[in-house]
Amino acid sequence: MIELKNLSFSYENSSEAKGQLRGIDLHVKKGELVILSGRSGCGKTTLTRILNGLCPGFYPGKLEGGYSLDGEDALKMPIHRLGTMVGSVFQDPRSQFFATNTTDEIVLGMENIPLERPVMQERLNTVCKQMNIERLIDRRIFPLSSGEKQLIAIASVCAMEPKVIVLDEPSANLDSEAARCPIG
């Protein structure tokens, strides 16, 4: 499903080792869960940005090596196509919200795929039930707690049903109960 071969990346105008990846080899099979851990600045976020196409597209730098997704060269995929295959939740969910209402935010990605309204409604209902967040439906996003915003961001990605879900610090804003299993 995901294959990284001798993948290296360094940010443009960066002479520091921080934010650089060198010689990463990784093979992730369908259905497999991989957790990357390491000290701050070791490249975890950079790797997530490569997986979802933000590096080098929006974060310029030098990218070498190979990255394939489902046997296709992900480095040659248009960003919009990669975006339908790789769903991302960032460290700070506020940085990825485009709507002001929770329901609108959860369905936004599905509208852009695009999916038919009945399919979107079914996925919305399913994800909210699985994640036990029905109480957050049809609410304004900005007054929500950081943890509730994190759950909305995760629900939005899950509702799109991408082949790969990349979570960067997924439990950072969640309490211990919600962090145990935000996807039910």
Each language-model region and where it sits:
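The feature captures the beta-strand-to-loop junction immediately N-terminal to the Walker
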Residues: 37-39
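Conserved ABC ATPase "signature" region
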Residues: 118-136
